[in-house]
Amino acid sequence: SIARRQRQMCIRDRYKDGDIIIIRYEGPKGGPGMREMLQTTGAIYGQGKGEKVALITDGRFSGATRGFCIGHVGPEASVGGPIALLRNGDVIDIDAKKGTINVRLSKKELQKRRKKWRPKKINFGNGTLWKYAQTVGPAYLGAPTHPGGKNEVKVYADI
């Protein structure tokens, strides 16, 4: 998978200072289930590059993650979000103060890539993971798995 190759790239130290590492197809639908990225961030720090590269993913991070890591990016790659359209060599600008991520591509190029994009083929056609991937909502809504949860706005916890 794309995510597996990206993680292996980090583990094997196949990137350079200033790179932005993209791990996609790890969101609620694409994972499915938003796998933890701690192994990848641990490898980056273990190689002494934690302060020299950024990591962007539609997956998730634990509280142990350090460095310039951006997770829960949505819409996720598996539903055709912008992260699915990125390619090696694309220049990406991250502005942490403004809270923006932009790729330096023309609208025409992005439209061209969107036309060519096809959903990633999943390697399971039935069972629990398939059912989960078919019903789960986006991360920004809490990855709900029931139709009513996608529109639920009431918080039931005392905070």
PLM segments and residue spans:
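Phosphate/diphosphate-binding loops
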Residues: 43, 48-61, 65-105
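Glycine-rich phosphate/diphosphate-binding loops and the adjacent beta-loop-alpha structural elements
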Residues: 22-33
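Charged helix-capping and loop-helix junction motifs
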Residues: 36-42
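Alpha-helix N-cap/helix-initiation motif
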Residues: 33-34, 46
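Intein/HINT protein-splicing elements and their conserved insertion hotspots or analogous self-processing inserts
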Residues: 80-81, 85-159
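Glycine-rich phosphate/diphosphate-binding loops that line cofactor/substrate pockets in enzymes
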Residues: 12-20
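Single conserved hydrophobic/aromatic residue that forms the stacking wall/gate
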Residues: 1-11
